[in-house]
């Protein structure tokens, strides 16, 4: 077990961080996609008595409604430019000498080039018109002045335009550009602004946007499925906590059909109280990793908890990676981790094939095709669990699978569910990538502001909206929104219609 741990540690440190298993499949399943290359040898395929024969596979193919592999991908080539981009025509003309004597001339499009206009700093001077009136009252004349109403700003008194503030938000939360680098970029263009000013803008903008995030949360809780995940964040000035201690950014993904939402929430704790608060009032399916903090939430709120096969697969992949390499000239003997990984990979292969289908069709296919594979996995683990060291990586992976089994098989009962929590992990990835650049938040207030901005940006992206354009529209409209209906109109799915 110590050797196993050392090999895994060495692989994690030096090897590429891909989770693709070297051992893909021990069987030539009839459903296997043509694009999946099987590297297992015939000896490995025959190693386990449970491996189906060719006759078995032919019978399976006759019984199951097998989906044909997707057509081969087209060869890569130049993609056409988006039709919604503005276009400017540049006319290349002949000289008078060259076209002398021609009966006519005409233009043809010779080529297209993608162009960019670099950022440019300017000063907007608001010239407010005022009118002077002379009012006569009891033989006395008094001057009265009225002024044109200035547009409302979400941060009154700020020296930056809404466009500049949104530019700062998008650069940090979409592009992972820390404020100190934005400070130097603005200075290069002639705009002298300190990073403290930029940080204050980020916190100030979060206040009016909180109302919008609250409404998005209400819509998310009205859906049938929520996916949840959490990741670490360092907040330096969290009261009562060391600067180096772990705090957490939580993400929930869900919403009714046509109203996808991604919500972030900062909390210094990883206790069950946080998800309890985030999904209060929700009833449906909650898909998570194996973190025990979600268990009490689901029991208390009568929520069906869905497991994540990604985490299960990852544990068997670690067990596979930690195996000793076969000596030169000797055949590789497939291990129990290899066998289980092959079965798990078959589950994923089925999911890729049925991806275009409706929820009802997915449910049917899972019953016909995934259920038998799940039964094989469970039977194999039950038969072999006592044959491996309990504290070894394969033993730990088997224990995890057994403990999570009911949650891992729930996805086969509803075609709307996913085999893994990968969508929540993908939703939190922009935060993880950004964290590598800006490293930490200084204060809890800043971390909460970041959660609000990530929520709106990622929800806008999930609804097909460009974040910069969307946030400018929202921040110009919010100061004039006096009712819930007016704020509702600014939700991303209402603007994409």
PLM regions: where:
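Short, flexible loop/hinge motifs at secondary-structure junctions
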Residues: 1-159, 227-228, 254, 366
């Amino acid at each position: 077990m110590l050797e196993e741990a050392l090999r895994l540690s060495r692989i994690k440190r030096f090897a590429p961080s891909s989770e693709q298993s070297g051992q893909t499949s021990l069987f030539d399943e009839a459903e296997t996609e043509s694009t999946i290359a099987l590297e297992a040898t015939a000896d490995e395929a025959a190693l386990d008595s449970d491996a189906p024969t060719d006759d078995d596979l032919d019978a399976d193919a006759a019984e199951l409604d097998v989906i044909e592999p997707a057509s081969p991908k087209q060869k890569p080539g130049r993609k056409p430019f988006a039709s919604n981009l503005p276009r400017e025509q540049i006319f290349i003309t002949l000289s008078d000498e060259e076209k002398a004597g021609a009966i006519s001339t005409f233009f043809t499009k010779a080529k297209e080039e993608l162009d960019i206009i670099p950022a440019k700093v300017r000063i907007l001077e608001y010239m407010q018109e005022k009118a002077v009136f002379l009012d006569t009252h009891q033989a006395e004349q008094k001057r009265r002045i009225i002024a044109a109403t200035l547009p409302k700003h979400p941060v009154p008194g700020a020296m930056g335009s809404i466009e500049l503030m949104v530019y700062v938000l998008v650069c940090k939360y979409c592009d992972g550009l820390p404020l100190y680098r934005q400070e130097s970029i603005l200075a290069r263009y002639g705009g002298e602004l300190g990073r403290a000013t930029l940080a204050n803008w980020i916190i100030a903008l979060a206040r009016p946007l909180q109302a919008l995030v609250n409404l998005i949360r209400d819509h998310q809780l009205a859906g049938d499925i929520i996916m949840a995940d959490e990741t670490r964040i360092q907040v330096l000035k969290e009261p009562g906590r060391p600067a180096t201690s772990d705090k957490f950014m939580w993400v929930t993904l869900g919403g009714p059909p046509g109203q996808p939402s991604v919500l972030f929430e900062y909390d210094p704790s990883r206790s069950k109280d946080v998800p309890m608060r985030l999904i209060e009032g929700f009833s449906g399916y909650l898909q998570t990793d194996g973190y025990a903090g979600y268990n009490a939430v689901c029991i208390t709120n009568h929520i069906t908890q869905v497991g994540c096969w990604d985490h299960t697969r990852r544990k068997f992949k670690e067990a596979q990676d930690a195996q000793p390499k076969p000596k030169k000239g000797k055949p590789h003997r497939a291990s129990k981790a290899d066998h289980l990984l092959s079965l798990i990979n078959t589950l994923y292969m089925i999911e890729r094939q049925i991806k275009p289908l409706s929820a009802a069709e997915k449910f049917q296919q899972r019953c016909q095709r995934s259920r038998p594979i799940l039964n094989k996995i469970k039977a194999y683990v039950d038969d072999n669990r006592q044959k491996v060291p309990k504290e070894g990586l394969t033993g730990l992976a088997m224990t995890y699978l057994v403990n999570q089994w009911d949650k891992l098989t729930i996805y086969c009962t509803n075609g709307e569910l996913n085999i893994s929590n990968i969508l929540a992990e993908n939703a939190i990835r922009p935060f993880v990538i950004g964290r590598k650049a800006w490293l930490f938040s200084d204060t809890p207030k800043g971390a909460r502001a970041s959660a609000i901005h990530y929520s709106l940006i990622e929800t806008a992206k999930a609804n097909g909206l460009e974040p910069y354009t969307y946030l400018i529209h929202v921040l110009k409209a919010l100061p004039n929104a006096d009712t819930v209906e007016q704020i509702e109109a600014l939700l991303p799915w209402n603007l994409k219609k």
